[in-house]
Amino acid sequence: MFSQSACVQVHIKTNELHTAVVEKVILAMISSCRTDNNQALHKLLHVAVCEENYNV
């Protein structure tokens, strides 16, 4: 299972509501492709969502 995203953990103290929404989006995206063969895709989705929301 894909671990909780680092950016969500970092930002949760400063923007809990927004972070909770982002976390749900990430988890929903991950749950749609949850296989061992898709680990790279999981990481790409995680990075894309984090960059979209936090400009990291």
UniProtKB/Swiss-Prot annotation:
The keyword Cell wall biogenesis/degradation does not apply. Disruption phenotype: Male-specific lethality in embryos. One of its GO terms (biological process) is RNA splicing. It comes from the Eukaryota. Keywords: Differentiation, mRNA processing, mRNA splicing, Sexual differentiation. The keyword GTP-binding does not apply. Male determiner protein (M-factor) that controls male somatic sexual differentiation. Acts as a dominant factor that regulates the mRNA splicing of doublesex (dsx) transcripts and promotes expression of male splice forms of dsx. This is Male determiner protein Yob. The lineage of its organism: Eukaryota, Metazoa, Ecdysozoa, Arthropoda, Hexapoda.
